[in-house]
Amino acid sequence: MGRIFALLLMSLFAVHAVAQQDQKAWHVLIEPTFMHPEVSFPISGARRTVFVPGYMSDGDPQYFSKKDWDATGVTWDAFRARAAQNAIEKKVSGQLIRDQNKVVQYAAISSEDPLTATMVLAPDFLKKFKDIFGTTIFVAIPNRFTVYVFPALASEYKDYSPLIMRAYRDSTYPVSPEVFEISPGGIRAIGVFEDD
């Protein structure tokens, strides 16, 4: 019995040690407020979505507990800066969706990687869409595995509410029904997709 307890204690310590010491595993997660993470930070303008300091453990994103967050001894800004180095582009499938006139309406990005949603925070994410959509884009993140990118100018993104809401409702890991603007100034929520 003592060995089992010792092994359990060691495994719990190992998870905490990884979270605290392996900064390469740190990520800023974009999560729904209804998950009630112990530690979260606001996204400008967002009501239903927050930033959560997290880390990868056994292939899954985990939230920092309040105790583990405090134990890191880092500020939110320092954590974000370090996590941004980890927010590299993932291997994802993406496609440009065009209208009948062959004009790109949006980009659909999906992957089985549970960090797909975090790619919008990668330093080069905005640059990838600059030539197609301009320097400011709108983004929908309905679940951890799916991102939709829309042009900010002359965008009809609200026409896609049924698509976004279906991806949000049907997921085991929903993220947000909100729409975000990403620009050189950062990320902020600008509205909410709604069911028709």
Predicted features, each with a name:
Residues A19-D196:
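Contiguous interface-forming segments/domains that mediate binding rather than catalysis
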Residues A14-V15:
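N-terminal signal peptide c-region/cleavage motif recognized by signal peptidases
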Residues G2-L7:
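Sec-dependent signal peptide recognition
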